[in-house]
Amino acid sequence: TDIMNDVTNLSIIDLAKESISMYSNLYMCPVYGRIAAGQPNWAEECIEGRIPIDPELMGIVNPEEHFFLRVNGESMNNVIKNGAFALIHKQDTVKNGEIAVVLVNGDTATLKRFTKKDDIVVLEPDSSDSEFKTQIYDKTTPIRILGKYVGKMEINN
């Protein structure tokens, strides 16, 4: 009976170690407050939670350079649904046509397809709703790229 208990205990310990090692590669990616996917909305700097991601599985080299933003609106619904989490890589440049988190006027952020030509910045929605219009800014409006959209996590209700 003592031997049987030792075997049982050993199995439980081994299983626990295996479970821990299976999850040891997870990165707890921060989730920042909601972001507008319509007209730019106030940029929130608060972390509202964290979502575990497996950087290796997702092909992410530096997970600490990533964060999630909760999408609020329908202007990008062909790409990402309202309420979903947009995975963003922190970077200050993107190629024309890529989707970016853009800070407009220093205090409002939006998720849009980004294009820059000369001194003109174009932020374009990608929506099934024609109500959303392209936003065009000249050099008098401060524009700063906060990051590039690289993926999403959608919660099915």
Task: List each language-model region with its residue ranges.
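Short, compositionally biased
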Residues: 98-120
